[in-house]
Amino acid sequence: MNYQRGLDTWVGTILGTFCALLLVVAQGEASESRQYTEEFHQTYPLTAGGRVELDNINGAVHITAWDRNEVKVDAVKYAGSKQRLDEARIEVEAGGNFVSVRTKYPDHNHTFNGGWNDPAGVEYTLSVPRGARLDEIKLINGPLDIHGVTAEVRASCINGKMLADGLQGRVKLSAINGRMEARFERLSDSPVELSSVNGGIALTLPSDAKAELEASTVSGGIDDDFGLHVRHHRFVGNDLRGELGGGGTRILLSNVNGRIEVRHANDGHAISPAKDLNHDDRDDRDEDDDEI
C-alpha cells in the first residue's frame, strides 16, 4: 500500500511539473497586452450539417449555436505593438458546406529557437448553426467553450479550460493542461471520447442515460454518481467499466494526471440502473494486502 501510494505520488509529481512548465512557457511567450487591437466581423452561409473548423494559437474561443444557416465570425486581434498586431492574420475559407477559420503568423513566429516573440493574440466568438459539425476546433493557449451544438464536436486545447454543454452527438475532446467539462443534453448512438493529460475531467450525463462506460486514470481518482465500481490497480492507476440503463452509447474517458468525475444531471428523470463489467470485484491493491 505504501509503495503504491508513493509511486502514484511520484508519477503525479513528474507529470504535474512537466505540464506546469508547459503552462509557464505558453504564458510567458504569448502576448496578453491589449495596447493595440483590431476587430474582424464577417458572416458566411453554411448548409445544414455543414462543417466548421477553427485553428487558433493564442486567445479565447467561444462557440455558440444559433438557428441560422450561417456562421458569424467576430474576432478581436490584440498585441503589445503595432508590428505584432499586423503580423497576425485571420484567414477564412468558405465553400457553402464548410467554413474554416485560422490564425496565421509569419514563419519565424512558429519556431522555438528565437520565434514566439510576443505574438499577437486573437479572441474568437463564433455563432454557428445548431446542427453544424465542429470538425476540428484547435486551440493552443486560452479557454475554449462550446454551447448548444447538437451535431459532432471534435475539439482540442493544449493550455486552458475547456467547457462544452448542450451536447447531443458524437464528441471527441482532448486537453493537455486544463480542466475539461462536458455536459450532455442527450446521448446518440455515436461514440464519446474525452482525454486529458493534466487536469480533471467532469462528464455530466442525462439521469436516464443508456451507455457503456469505460474510464481510466494513471494518477487520479474516479468518482461516479451511478454507483459503478472503481478498481484500484496494484501500482498505478484506477479504472471503471460498466453499463448504464442496459448499455448504449460507447463512452471512453482517460486521464493521466487528474480526476475523472461522472455525474448525472438534475433533470428529474429516474437514474439509470448500473451494471459493473469488471469481473473482479476486488481491488488489485486488496490482493496485495492479502499477500503481505
Where are these regions (language model features)?
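Intrinsically disordered, low-complexity terminal regions
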Residues: 2-292
